[in-house]
Amino acid sequence: MTAAPNDWDVVLRPHWTPLFAYAAAFLIAVAHVAGGLLLKVGSSGVVFQTADQVAMGALGLVLAGAVLLFARPRLRVGSAGLSVRNLLGDRIVGWSEVIGVSFPGGSRWARIDLADDEYIPVMAIQAVDKDRAVAAMDTVRSLLARYRPDLCAR
């Protein structure tokens, strides 16, 4: 049930978190690669091999890749419903399943409210983005009113 790129009315992404994720991933990768290259410099009593250097650099690249997962969050809204991509995985929630969208006080990100007190976190709309998060919630709520007018009548 993959929708074409033009089927989405709006695509929302966080603003600050990807920037911090890119910077942190870069620093982690550089530190581990540099540390790996410098393992054989000097004598500390431990004999490091080339495999240790390669492993140190590879570990840094793996950790940097894990940090880059924080740059993935995205919310797409369209006639098919809401497509939520957080750190791992992508889920399309049909309009028939949605009973609301909310941003509870004290939360780090928004959520899609489902039946039976269930919800899906939406990491694409984060509190750290402040005014952008407010604008994003306004956009999502206006699209909710368009596709689920029965919810707004309550």
Swiss-Prot record:
Entry GO CC: plasma membrane
Pfam families (alphabetical): bPH_6 (PF10756)
Keyword check for Transmembrane helix: yes
Keyword annotations: Cell membrane, Membrane, Transmembrane, Transmembrane helix
Gene Ontology biological process terms, A to Z: riboflavin biosynthetic process
Membrane topology: Multi-pass membrane protein
Main location, first listed in the record: membrane
Annotated protein name in UniProt: Uncharacterized protein Rv1417
Source organism of this protein record: Mycobacterium tuberculosis (strain ATCC 25618 / H37Rv)
